């Protein structure tokens, strides 16, 4: 029995530095390199936004994540429909984040969509040098009512 306790203790000690290393490697600014959205019901994957997508995600030493993605030929609005389209062609939120193995969880305290405030947003990630590869958990889509989707995003480190 004591061998199992020692083995588990050693595994915990090995994992803690790895999480600390990931946190140190996440800190900084990342620029959007690409993204896709996948629909659960059909398996269809399509570009996150068709054109002109831009975005950044920032992780601070203090444990805050801030992210914004825009896309699809955004222009200054002239009508209410234009204003609604601007809301549909962006995502922006921020909050304190924590690492849990291969995912980070953001406790959202400000967001472009008030429904996200007070929620935990879960993102699975993999660091590949200066690339951050991310996918979300399955969730209801804000842009495709009645659809369950997940998003795949690749970021590159800003130097």
PLM region spans:
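Bacterial N-terminal signal peptides
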Residues: 4-16
């Amino acid at each position: 029995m004591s061998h199992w306790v020692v083995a588990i203790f050693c595994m915990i000690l090995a994992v803690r530095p790895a999480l600390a290393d990931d946190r140190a490697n996440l800190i900084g600014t990342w620029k959007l390199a690409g993204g896709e959205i996948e629909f659960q019901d059909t398996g269809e994957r399509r570009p996150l936004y068709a054109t002109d997508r831009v975005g950044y995600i920032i992780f601070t030493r203090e444990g805050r994540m801030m992210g914004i993605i825009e896309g699809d030929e955004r222009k200054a609005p002239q009508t209410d429909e234009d204003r609604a389209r601007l809301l549909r062609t962006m995502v922006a939120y921020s909050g304190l984040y924590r690492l849990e193995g291969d995912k980070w969880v953001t406790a959202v305290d400000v967001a472009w969509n008030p429904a996200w405030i007070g929620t935990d947003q879960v993102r699975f990630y993999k660091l590949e040098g200066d690339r951050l590869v991310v996918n979300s958990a399955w969730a209801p889509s804000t842009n495709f009512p009645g659809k369950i989707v997940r998003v795949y995003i690749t970021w590159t480190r800003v130097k």
